[in-house]
Each structure stands twice: as C-alpha cells, then as structure tokens.
C-alpha cells in the first residue's frame, strides 16, 4: 500500500471519509455494504481517530491535517499489506502531530508485522524509525546500510554533506552548511558519479568510470570510486 505526502490532495473532496474507505474495501473484498462499513469504522479506531463513528460522515476538508493523514493510513491498511510505502507522510504536519503520526506508524508496524519503506529527507524520521537506510542521488542509490552506522559514519561524500547540512542544536550563530552546485538534470545524467561536479574529493576517474556498489568494512555498501580502488588494492 501507499501513503501519499498530502492527504488533502489525494482524498476526494466530494465524498465522505466513510464512503472512500468503504469503496476501497469493497473493490478488493466481496463483502456487504454493512460489513464494509463496520470494517471502515474499525480501521478508523485502529489509527486512533476520536469519535470514529462521526468521522465516517465527515468530508476531508472538515478534518485537520493530522486526522486526514490518519485516514490515509487507515486506507493503506484496508487489505492488510505486508509493505507500506510512505512518501514524506509527515511533511505537511506540525512537529507535535508529526511525532504522533510516526508513533502510530511504528506501533502499527509492530502490531501487524508489516514493513514500512519511508521516502524522506528528514534525518529525525530516519533515526527514529528506520532500521536501514538507502541514500539516493540523481535516481541512484549511492549508499546503504544500518541506520546508526550511516548516520554516525557516512561513507559517500553526498551522505556526509547531506548530514552536515542539518542544523545542530546548541551551536549558536554560524553559517549553515550547504552543498555547492546543483543536481544534474535527470534527462542528462553524466557518466560516472553524478555527484562528481559537487564533490570536493572528485578525481577525473569519477567522471569517466561506471561505479559499482562496494562493500565497506562497517557493513555498508557505497557507490564511490575511492572505496572501489581501496578494495582493488586490498585484493592485490
């Protein structure tokens, strides 16, 4: 199942929450209208929506952002999925509601034994919920491995710069780290490492060699020529 970033634009404005949930249930399950309504009510209660009976008859615009996202989560649970893809599910929410939604997703994951694939740029979300991380740049995975390892000891230059851009509490005034340059156009991906033109450690081979994922000594895999050369030297 899929949880979209903005539930206000994905939930139909002309139909009630209950109508949309019941439709999703009956499209995939051959059950009566009454049974589908009972299932929809149960799902709303599972995602901790208060006064669930009343919310069944509410329209999306009558709900808060957090409530709408809970409805989206309920809809994602309709067919008891083994995997949920959550695309920036907390971006449009304030910090307090964001924490509630993340806690809800985590508890649902544990209770139902399902997996969640988070698409996010928020390292707070990553550190709170994710067991493993895959960092992507220009449509390619450039580094993957255990969350704690990657956040503490990133191997790819892009991952390092990305983490450095996160403001640190208690640092006081100072310049915010940035990554120079711009990402490449996706219809003109350069050969070699797509990050080479923005990387301070790039060499000519970075721009001319197809770089494969390489295992590192700290249980991660990285798409960087520095690690490819290092592995070749060890093998020799």
Where are these regions (language model features)?
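Short helical segment in ABC ATPase nucleotide-binding domains corresponding to the A-loop/adjacent helical element
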Residues: 4, 8, 14-27, 37, ...
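Hydrophobic anchor residue at the start of the ABC signature
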Residues: 21, 73, 97, 101
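ABC ATPase nucleotide-binding domain helical subdomain, centered on the C-loop/LSGGQ "ABC signature"
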Residues: 30, 34-49, 53-57, 152, ...
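Short catalytic/signature loops enriched in Gly
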Residues: 50-53, 144-236
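Conserved ABC ATPase signature
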Residues: 58-63, 67
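A short, proline-enriched helix->beta-strand linker immediately N-terminal to the Walker B motif
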Residues: 78-82
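P-loop NTP-binding/switch modules centered on Walker-like glycine-rich loops
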Residues: 85-89, 93-174
């Amino acid at each position: 199942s899929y949880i979209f970033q903005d539930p206000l634009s994905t939930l139909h404005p002309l139909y009630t929450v209950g109508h949309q949930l019941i439709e999703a249930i009956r499209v995939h399950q051959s059950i009566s209208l009454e049974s589908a309504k009972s299932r929809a009510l149960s799902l709303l209660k599972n995602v901790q929506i208060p006064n669930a009976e009343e919310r069944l008859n509410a329209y999306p615009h009558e709900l808060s952002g957090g409530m709408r996202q809970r409805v989206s989560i309920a809809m994602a649970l309709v067919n008891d999925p083994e995997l949920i893809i959550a695309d920036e599910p907390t971006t449009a929410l304030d910090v307090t509601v964001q924490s509630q939604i993340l806690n809800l997703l985590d508890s649902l994951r544990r209770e139902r034994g399902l997996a969640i694939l988070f698409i996010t740029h928020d390292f707070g979300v990553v550190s709170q919920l994710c067991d493993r991380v895959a960092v992507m740049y220009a449509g390619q995975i450039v580094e993957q491995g255990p969350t704690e390892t990657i956040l503490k000891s990133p191997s790819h230059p892009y991952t390092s710069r990305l983490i450095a851009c996160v403001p640190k509490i208690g640092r006081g005034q100072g310049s915010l780290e940035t990554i120079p340059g711009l990402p490449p156009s996706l219809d003109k991906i350069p050969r070699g490492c797509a990050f080479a033109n923005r990387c301070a450690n790039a060499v000519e081979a970075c721009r001319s060699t197809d770089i494969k994922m390489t295992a590192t000594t700290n249980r991660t895999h990285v798409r960087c020529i520095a690690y490819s050369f290092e592995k070749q030297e060890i093998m020799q």
